[in-house]
Amino acid sequence: MSFAMTDPATTMSWVQVIVLSIVQGLTEFLPVSSSGHLRIVSQLFWGEDAGASFTAVIQLGTELAVLVFFAKDIWRILTAWFAGLADKSKRNFDYRMGWMVIAGTIPVGLAGVLLKDLIRENFRNLWITATVLILFSLVFILAERRGKKTRGFEELTMKDAVVMGLWQCLALIPGVSRSGGTISGGLFLNLDREVATRFSFLLAIPAVLASGLFSLPDAFDPQAGQAASGLQLLVGSGIGFVVGYISIAWLLKFVSNHSFAWFAAYRIPLGLLVMALLGLA
């Protein structure tokens, strides 16, 4: 196990793919930063970064878990959105929700394109990951304390969607957490904890799917991180799907009566541990 930096131009082993896919599935939907965990586990056990492209592609498996878990909600929103486009009299809340997801996706889409090189190179520094794990935990605690948690799902507005979309941009930095960023934003907007969590999942779908498909060619490029075969990416995505589905069900049950501050209690010691290991290395 090593935190030393090595030449990334290597191919991934099956053990790496399986372990990292399980880590991805476990952490993608929890506010602990899946990209941060993948970065830490890769460096700790194999001494090298699996790469942002590999991470983005296996996220497709966990996003498929979201599509399956929320299939009824997604279908209802999509049908209402298309019906509303054709007939103004059918523009109900689900129609507006379709536009809210689109509006909330635009900020992270623009940030991802404009900051692509910065994200894949500078932001993947382990010192940054460890520091952000600690600092953003304080944001969780503040959001829990300041948020009134009184607003329901049908009280969501376009402004809420854009604000949570801006919070989602922070997730481009390993250590923040996509769900942690958007849910914190929702809590600051006084949304109920479960409402913020559910909208966070819906908001992530287009952004993560686009990121994964866009990064697919780079996942086979050793210069973009460790190279993985097509079969490895397929198996990794499958593992991420199964583990991710279980994680979604657990998180929704957990947030109904538990504070997000519990995740801060995990993130802070983890960040300190990584810093200690980096210092020793």
UniProtKB/Swiss-Prot annotation:
Reaction catalysed by this enzyme: di-trans,octa-cis-undecaprenyl diphosphate + H2O = di-trans,octa-cis-undecaprenyl phosphate + phosphate + H(+)
Superkingdom field: Bacteria
Transmembrane segments: 12-32, 50-70, 99-119, 123-143, 156-176, 199-219, 231-251, 260-280
Pfam families: BacA (PF02673)
An example Gene Ontology CC term for this record: plasma membrane
Statement: the UniProt record of this protein carries the keyword Zinc: no
GO molecular function term, any single one: undecaprenyl-diphosphatase activity
Parts forming coiled coils: none
Lipid bilayer topology: Multi-pass membrane protein
Catalytic activity, EC: 3.6.1.27
Main location: membrane
Additional remark text: Bacitracin is thought to be involved in the inhibition of peptidoglycan synthesis by sequestering undecaprenyl diphosphate, thereby reducing the pool of lipid carrier available.
Its biological purpose: Catalyzes the dephosphorylation of undecaprenyl diphosphate (UPP). Confers resistance to bacitracin.
Protein's recorded name: Undecaprenyl-diphosphatase
